[in-house]
């Protein structure tokens, strides 16, 4: 049995930055909260919780907020929400990914120039909820809309680059616009992983994608790989024990952007142990 591991695995730069800022805060403060899970990875979140980092859900303010630090995750939040939280917490640590922040700023600037902002994305995704705080009348959709006037089409940073291009083509073909701007705001790192996952999936009998069940980019990689081979998404290395490896000679492995590289090594070790037991 041969294993092909993607070259680009583990945390992306945005997640790595967010975790580094969080760990620095642990060393300086006793009471720390994150607004939602700092990353879509149960193991990492549990590890931080053991070190005193508690997860807050939206609209819940703890009694000790005045003496606590609040960490804004990489998905970002709206400016209004940030302003309100600054009034309540002792300190705000904003770990919004620079790529996501650029999307917010670009959308806001172009909207002020008189364009209608259309974003290819999932309206329920935290990143898109935050964008709404910058451009309240932005259209966020997965289905190409019929548009008119001056339009700017952008994308949620974690969407599939191929699906974004398809969305753009279909939007143009069915719209009556006077002017259109298209800005590719898909994260280059996730786009690169997408292409690599596709390349590996074409060579293997089974593709294993490691990442959180609620991770948008991990789900996207699983969807892409499944077009070419059998693909299984796992959240923890322990789930390897549930996989059927019968008639599998080639295995591909990749990860979502919130998955630590150590998980890949553990998964490989478990696969090798399974093989040796046969």
Curated annotation (Swiss-Prot):
Binding site for [4Fe-4S] cluster: 12, 97, 187
The protein's enzyme class: oxidoreductase
EC number, as in UniProt: 1.17.7.4
Requisite cofactors: [4Fe-4S] cluster
CDD domains tied to this protein: lytB_ispH
Molecular-function GO term, any one: metal ion binding
Sequence positions that bind (2E)-4-hydroxy-3-methylbut-2-enyl diphosphate: 40, 75, 125, 157, 215-217, 258
InterPro entries tied to this protein: LytB/IspH
GO biological process, alphabetically ordered: dimethylallyl diphosphate biosynthetic process; isopentenyl diphosphate biosynthetic process, methylerythritol 4-phosphate pathway; terpenoid biosynthetic process
Catalytic activity of the protein: isopentenyl diphosphate + 2 oxidized [2Fe-2S]-[ferredoxin] + H2O = (2E)-4-hydroxy-3-methylbut-2-enyl diphosphate + 2 reduced [2Fe-2S]-[ferredoxin] + 2 H(+); dimethylallyl diphosphate + 2 oxidized [2Fe-2S]-[ferredoxin] + H2O = (2E)-4-hydroxy-3-methylbut-2-enyl diphosphate + 2 reduced [2Fe-2S]-[ferredoxin] + 2 H(+)
Superkingdom: Bacteria
Covalent S-S links between cysteines: none
Binding site for isopentenyl diphosphate: 40, 75, 125, 215-217, 258
Cofactor: how bound: Binds 1 [4Fe-4S] cluster per subunit.
Similarity remark: Belongs to the IspH family.
Name used for this protein in its record: 4-hydroxy-3-methylbut-2-enyl diphosphate reductase
Species this protein is from: Pseudothermotoga lettingae (strain ATCC BAA-301 / DSM 14385 / NBRC 107922 / TMO) (Thermotoga lettingae)
Species lineage: Bacteria, Thermotogati, Thermotogota, Thermotogae, Thermotogales
């Amino acid at each position: 049995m041969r294993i092909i591991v993607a070259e680009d695995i583990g945390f992306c730069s945005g997640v790595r930055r967010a975790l580094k800022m969080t760990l620095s805060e642990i060393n300086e403060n006793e009471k720390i909260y994150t607004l939602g899970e700092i990353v879509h990875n149960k193991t990492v979140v549990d590890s931080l919780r053991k070190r005193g980092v508690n997860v807050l859900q939206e609209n819940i303010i703890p009694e000790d907020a005045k003496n606590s630090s609040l960490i804004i995750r990489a998905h970002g939040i709206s400016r209004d929400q940030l302003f309100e939280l600054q009034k309540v917490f002792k300190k705000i640590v904003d770990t919004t990914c620079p790529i996501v922040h650029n999307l917010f700023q670009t959308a806001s600037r172009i909207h002020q120039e008189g364009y209608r902002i259309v974003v290819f994305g999932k309206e329920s995704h935290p990143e898109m909820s935050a964008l709404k705080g910058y451009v309240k009348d932005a259209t966020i959709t997965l289905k190409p809309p019929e548009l008119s006037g001056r339009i700017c089409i952008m994308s949620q940073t974690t969407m599939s680059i191929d699906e974004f291009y398809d969305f753009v083509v279909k939007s143009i073909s069915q719209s009556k616009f006077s002017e259109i701007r298209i800005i590719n705001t898909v994260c280059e790192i996730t786009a690169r992983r997408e292409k690599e996952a596709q390349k590996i999936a074409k060579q293997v009998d089974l593709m294993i994608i490691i990442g959180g069940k609620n991770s948008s980019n991990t789900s996207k990689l699983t969807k892409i790989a499944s077009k070419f081979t059998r693909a299984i998404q796992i959240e923890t290395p322990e789930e390897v024990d549930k996989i059927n490896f019968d008639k599998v000679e080639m295995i591909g492995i990749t990860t979502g952007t919130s998955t630590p590289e150590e998980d890949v090594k553990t998964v490989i070790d478990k696969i090798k142990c399974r093989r040796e037991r046969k």
